[in-house]
Amino acid sequence: AVGVMVFADNVVEYRPPASRSGSLQGVIHTLDKAQPAKGTELKHPMSHFQERIKRRGLVAVISDFYCDTQELLDNIRPLAMQGQDVILFHLLDPAELNPNIKESTLYEDLETGHAIEVSPVFMNKEYHDRIRAHISAIQNTASGMNADHVLINTSEPLDKALHSYLTFREKRG
């Protein structure tokens, strides 16, 4: 059975798990038409999902995880405690992972519209340290709830990243 829930502050679309012919195609269609939102709030969508999930299974959460790690833990851990096999697919753009700026640049937050000017010194040192610390915090959060964390660079084909992860899972047993 396969299903999907697309959410931002609230549930945008929910297709319950089903094993009928065409279910996977419906999930792909839902993901394909999903639009970026002005932020994400985990509490309501995750409680909505937990109320509706009937059987144990694999739950993949796909996000940039620009959220507080405690909020992530508080809202995803109940799924793991229900016996769900949780995977956090952490999507980041190459420019988020390794920014390369030569002069002061104005960056605009696509979710809030807030703009900030940043210097090359900040981006090449402090930002790099902060993003690595955040990725590490998400990894530790996943580990703390016995979930997998998979960092995906959006410049890589998704099928390659998924294949690598599935190969890792198969070897792990």
Segments predicted by a language model, with ranges:
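Exposed, interaction-prone extracellular/peripheral surfaces
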Residues: 1-173
